[in-house]
Amino acid sequence: MNNLLIILSVILVAGISAPAYAQTISDHVVINEVDTNPFGDDSQSISEWVELYNPTDSDVDLSGWEIASTTVLKKTLTIPDGTIISPGDFLIFNYEKIWFTDSSELVELRNADGVIIDTTPFIVDLENDFSSWQRSYDGFSDWEFSLASAGSSNGKFIEFSNSSPV
């Protein structure tokens, strides 16, 4: 019985700590932040936006890539030819009035061949304020609802090493 408790305890601790270690920084252009319900009346102005981020070490040509609403409205923006995102840069895209629904929206980034490169989790934004769904750190896999930071960093993830000096 004691062995069973020890095994279950180890599994519990591993399960709790695993998500913290399982999060990774992407090696491709990502959807870094989305505001599906910005302050104001979405039907009166083009105000919904998507921020892309390039965590790689190379320029990426986004010509013909698509940013798509995949739920109710199914509206797709095609990124213009000649659009380049440099390493570490952010690009903001607006499309048209009411691009997204405010509840249960999933946004996809597709390359010029239609291959899905990145997706958001299902997001809900009923606040009509200055908050957005964003990665907790630029390019990181966790998402949070926080004060919008369009075109700028959500924060950089810093890894620490436990190695001892020689």
Model-predicted segments: where are they?
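Intrinsically disordered, low-complexity linkers and terminal tails enriched in Ser/Thr/Pro/Gly
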Residues: 4-9, 18-166
